[in-house]
A protein has these predicted regions:
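Short, well-structured segments within or immediately adjacent to enzyme catalytic domains
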Residues: 1-128
Length: 128
């Protein structure tokens, strides 16, 4: 689940997301204004080695490194659904996104100048 969709797990704060306070968090559907519901991803496939909790955290302040990595086991693509209900299969462009599964949990995947990470950041939250 998108780490910015906190769903009331934390106290509602004027400071934004628990993870990145300068970005919006979303506790209910009426909180979704930017990006729009059709551009805010809700759930996706996460890379098996990256799974460490119920959220996929996107490092919106570092466009050169994944915190948690989306999956790429659908022929080099990953599935996303969005707040408005539609879903997309995103074909990954960068080798740094298509990481071989090692069955060993870790986080922090280098992705210098990644077009894939830029795509996910743009659809994860918005600057407050």
């Amino acid at each position: 689940m998108n780490g910015f969709v906190e769903g009331g797990a934390y106290s509602k704060s004027a400071n934004g997301s628990v993870w990145y306070p300068t970005f919006f968090n979303y506790n209910k559907t009426t909180d979704v204004m930017r990006p729009s519901p059709s551009n805010l991803w809700l759930m996706n496939d996460e890379h098996p080695d990256s799974i460490n909790d119920g959220w996929e955290i996107t490092g919106v302040e570092d466009p050169n490194s994944w915190v948690d990595l989306p999956a790429s086991y659908h022929n080099g693509a990953g599935g996303f659904n969005f707040v408005d209900g539609h879903s997309e299969i995103k074909k990954w462009l960068e080798p740094s996104t298509r990481v071989k599964v090692k069955y060993s949990q870790y986080n922090g995947f280098p992705a210098p100048k990644s077009r894939d990470l830029a795509w996910v950041i743009e659809r994860s939250s918005a600057k407050r």
